Amino acid sequence: MVKAVVLLSGGLDSATVLAIARQQGYECYALSVSYGQRHGAELAAAKNLARSLGATAHKIIQVDLSTFGGSALIDKEREIPTDGVTPGIPSTYVPARNTIMLSIALAWAEVLGSGDIFIGVNAIDYSGYPDCRPEYIEAFETMANVATKAGIEGTRLAIHAPLMNLSKAEIIKRGGVLGVDYSMTVSCYQADDAGLACGVCDSCRLRRAGFESADVPDVTRYHAGFRQTPAS
């Protein structure tokens, strides 16, 4: 069986990607990164999802980006925006996060003898992050094939982004067919330690709208004080 490293945050998108990679016949090695995010619920969800979705192994790597700050996701002094998606790069963008995660995944893939890395970036229902675009993935793949022993020796490395051109509704439908239990996932930027979602941050809004558009019941676990209304 061909091995693949799958970046697994614990959220809806990455869980779907793990299910897709498994469905495609890969032996999946799930990789999560503790980068100084506000809560541990996402990583706890990743552990459970790796087990539920049949990953062969799961590693959590520590890289504390909160030392630098620069993002509302890792700096608790900055507020998480709750006014909906706005033009431009949002304050929740974490500088170089995907580049760092993909680099770590690349290192593990080389050790495993794997030529395949999966990541759940999306260019349709995304929040304006520059490292979620097709040209970014293409550029990283080019770099990977120049900068690694495997690439130089002729084993081509591929970065798979199967959600790139899917809407959130399409992602949810795809995951549903593959048996992903979305109640196990945590997408909220400011979830509590139990993984309960705020319902109003950009990530929650996109997720809620996705369930609505897919006409699928929203199984997200919200804070008791959140009154669910149409997201669209």
Swiss-Prot record:
The gene is queC. ATP binds at residues 8-18. Catalyzes the ATP-dependent conversion of 7-carboxy-7-deazaguanine (CDG) to 7-cyano-7-deazaguanine (preQ(0)). This is 7-cyano-7-deazaguanine synthase. GO terms for biological process: queuosine biosynthetic process. CDD domains: QueC-like (cd01995). Keywords: ATP-binding, Ligase, Metal-binding, Nucleotide-binding, Queuosine biosynthesis, Zinc. Pfam families: QueC (PF06508). Pathway: Purine metabolism; 7-cyano-7-deazaguanine biosynthesis. One of its GO terms (molecular function) is zinc ion binding.
